[in-house]
A protein has these predicted regions:
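P-loop NTPase Walker
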Residues: 1-70, 167, 221, 233
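Conserved helicase NTPase motor core
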Residues: 21, 29, 48, 73, ...
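ATP-hydrolysis module of ASCE/P-loop NTPase motor domains
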Residues: 44, 65-150, 173, 235-241
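Short alpha-helix boundary/capping elements
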Residues: 56, 60, 107-114, 177, ...
Length: 244
């Protein structure tokens, strides 16, 4: 659906391929769409295909000179939380499972834009979680590292504080298409809404019955409320599986 829509925009409306941004949730899906589009059009393209994280990190690289070395590795994250738990005298049955659960909750807090004082942990007392969260952020800052959620947080802050930079990216990508929209979280959606202005040329594809990232804070209700946020939007229901 997405690839044919891109082809339609460029062929029928003469839209510059360089003005089009296609976003999905995995590198494999982004690469597959790129290949499908190039097969449709018979060659390379200036359309940008990427994941939320790759697009946001590209923006941060240009603004702040980040490199891949600034991205924290999963094992580093786990070690940070294990060290904090030990320093706090915590004795979970399984250190790795506990660390992974805490990291998932930290991701939810960031991705859902939840005030820390309003978040209730499922894995430890709330005061303990807040200490772990603050300690994790401090370790990351001292090491000069960012995680995948930080990419989005920093991008939102950049767009909010630097309207000139936001305006430049709005001019760069005048048409935004998003696949698997049911997997979007609140932070990603806020950035997309900012990026899509002032023309609001958004095209989304999703199935609210198939969200696979609920554990990461995905909110299918964002898709269900899309027409409320964009009253002029049209809806097309597909009853054919185009991937089979």
């Amino acid at each position: 659906v997405i690839t044919h829509r891109v082809q339609y925009l460029t062929k029928e409306y003469g839209i510059d391929p360089g003005d089009i941004l296609v976003i999905t949730f995995t590198r494999a899906a982004a690469e597959e769409m790129r290949e499908r589009y190039e097969a449709l059009t018979g060659g390379g393209s200036r359309v940008t295909f990427g994941t939320f994280h790759s697009i946001f990190f590209r923006i941060l690289k240009l603004a702040y000179r980040y490199t891949a070395d600034n991205i924290v590795r999963e094992e580093q994250q786990m070690q940070f939380v294990r060290e904090l738990a030990q320093a706090g005298g915590l004795e979970p049955e399984d250190e790795n499972e506990f660390a992974a659960s805490i990291l998932s909750e930290i991701s939810s807090v960031k991705g859902e834009r939840i005030a820390l004082e309003h978040y209730y942990s499922k894995n430890c007392p709330d005061a303990v979680f807040r200490q772990l969260y603050a300690g994790y952020e401090e370790k990351m800052r001292r090491a000069g590292l960012i995680d995948f959620d930080d990419m989005m947080v920093l991008c939102l802050e950049l767009f909010t504080e630097r309207k000139d930079i936001l305006s430049a990216w709005q001019r760069r990508y005048r048409y935004i298409l998003i696949d698997e929209f049911q997997d979007i979280n609140r932070l990603q959606y806020e950035i997309v809404r900012m990026l899509a202005k002032p023309e609001d040329n958004l095209f989304i594809v999703g199935d609210d019955d198939q969200s696979i990232y609920r554990f990461r804070g995905a909110k299918p209700e964002i898709m269900l409320g899309f027409e409320r946020d964009y009253p002029g939007a049209g809806r097309i229901l597909l009853d054919v599986n185009y991937r089979s």
